[in-house]
């Protein structure tokens, strides 16, 4: 590892990103493509991920495919793994980014919304990580799993009422640590990224509510919100040889929010 390229290049690698039709999912896919990985972009909106995949392939000279799938369905998980393997080869970088963030007062929170948060934010990442890890173990190949959590995996929200989101992201952060311990011996490194307040299609509505943006900036030491592309460096680091002795970690990309 005597050059910058050898540390961070992902050429010859194959990544899969869920929730890749918008927001940070697109940025995660861009990060892998910039570093040279072939990628499968997964989301329920197949038309969008297919279009984004074509753009990434043209811009970065990588293979990229879009797959329409619901990550809470076992049959869809099996299908997306098969389609990715057929088009690109076996996945050795998984980015579990798909998520939902239902809001509501805890005392009135609906069971259906609670169950959906668990299914999308916790169960789906585990089921997909299982599938990727089994194949890596079977073939004796190393790999990387990156789970997207949140600042609310470790602190409560003073801006939103996010009981289900906070609980599931905290669970995913600790699942990250557990999988890191169990799979380290196979060369499968499992880490997480905890983004702070970053405007995306999913978050811009809440940020735009009166007073919210100012409060968020005030609570952040850097005194500004993040930019979507600022997630890319952490993704490339955790997917590449640069993080070869890093597993079980949660990397904050939050402008210092959790450093208070």
Model-inferred region functions:
Residues 2-7, 236, 247-260:
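Short C-terminal tail/terminal secondary-structure segment
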Residues 21-23:
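Conserved glycine-rich cofactor-binding loop
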Residues 46-47, 68-79, 111, 229-230:
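The beta1-alpha1 cofactor-binding region of Rossmann-like NAD(H)/NADP(H)-dependent oxidoreductases
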Residues 95, 184, 189, 246-248:
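Short, small/polar-rich loop/turn modules that mediate ligand/substrate recognition or access, typified
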Residues 129, 168, 176:
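Active-site helix of classical SDR
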Residues 134, 181-185, 244:
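Alpha-helical segment proximal to the catalytic Tyr-Lys
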């Amino acid at each position: 590892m005597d050059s910058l390229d050898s540390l961070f290049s992902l050429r010859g690698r194959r990544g899969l990103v869920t929730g890749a039709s918008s927001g940070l999912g697109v940025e995660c896919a861009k990060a892998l493509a910039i570093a040279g990985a072939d990628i499968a972009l997964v989301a329920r909106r197949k038309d969008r991920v297919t279009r984004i995949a074509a753009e990434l392939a043209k811009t970065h000279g990588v293979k990229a495919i879009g797959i329409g799938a619901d990550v809470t369905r076992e049959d869809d998980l099996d299908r997306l793994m098969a389609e990715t393997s057929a088009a690109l080869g076996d996945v050795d970088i998984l980015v579990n980014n798909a998520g939902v963030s239902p809001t509501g007062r805890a005392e009135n929170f609906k069971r259906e919304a609670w169950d959906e948060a668990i299914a999308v934010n916790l169960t789906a990442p585990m089921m997909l990580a299982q599938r990727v890890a089994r194949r890596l173990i079977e073939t004796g190949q190393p790999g990387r799993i990156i789970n997207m959590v949140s600042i609310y995996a470790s602190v409560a929200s003073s801006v939103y009422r996010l009981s289900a989101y906070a609980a599931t992201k905290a669970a995913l952060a600790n699942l990250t640590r557990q999988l890191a311990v169990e799979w380290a011996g196979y060369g499968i490194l499992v880490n997480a990224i905890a983004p702070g307040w970053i405007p995306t299609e999913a978050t811009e509505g809440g940020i735009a509510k009166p007073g919210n943006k100012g409060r968020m900036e005030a609570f952040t030491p850097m005194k500004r919100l993040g930019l979507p592309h600022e997630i890319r460096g952490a993704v490339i680091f955790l997917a590449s040889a640069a993080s070869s002795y890093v597993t079980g970690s949660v990397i904050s990309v939050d402008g210092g929010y959790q450093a208070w």
